[in-house]
Amino acid sequence: MRRKNVILVIFFLIFFIGFEFSDMTLAFINLPSSYTYYVTSFDKKLPKNVTLIIPTCSLNGDIAEIKPLREGNISLLDTQYGKMIKIEAEEVGHITITSFISSEKTIDIINENITLSPILERELLSKTENKKELSMVYRVKIPVYAEFEGNSTIYVTLHVESGFKALPFFFTFTIPWEPRYGWKPYAGHKYLEVKITKKGWQLAEGEERVRLIFAV
């Protein structure tokens, strides 16, 4: 009986140490989730005296909080398309409108509706799914208003990272956990970008790309 108890204690200690070691490895495995909404221009001569009216970043129907600008003004505006964001800036190089990052919470890119609002057209162009990954490409059109000096291209971009979480198991072994597509844990991203090249009210066209990498 004593020998049996000793063996049980040894097994318990091995499992406990293995579990704790596995828990420590999660710092190298788990990934933070994030989303960032921004406008950029890469032209040598950046657009000057810029006024933009662009969609909001929507989180399951709610408008994400917008960040104040260091130089310029940003505000919500009622339009014929609903609430939109108005930006007034002397120059546009890179302006972050909304940003979020979390090490605690993952984002289910498929089921959590983090997108731009309004989107007037969204057409699926391609979908590829296999054991390793899922990828989808959409053509999108959004209403925008733009006034600026010069001939420039302004990009409106939403970038979402799902993050990834695993559970500890034993030494270097972990259990992939969330987010999930069906029963499959994954890490993935969404990248939605439209291009503004004209002035005045217009339908700006771009692409939304979604890619999930399955962790099984």
Curated annotation (Swiss-Prot):
GO (cellular component) term, any one: membrane
TM stretches of this protein: 7-29
Membrane topology is: Single-pass membrane protein
Coarse class of the primary localization is: membrane
Q: Where in the cell is it found?
A: Membrane
The entry's keywords: Membrane, Transmembrane, Transmembrane helix
The entry's protein name is: Uncharacterized protein AF_0101
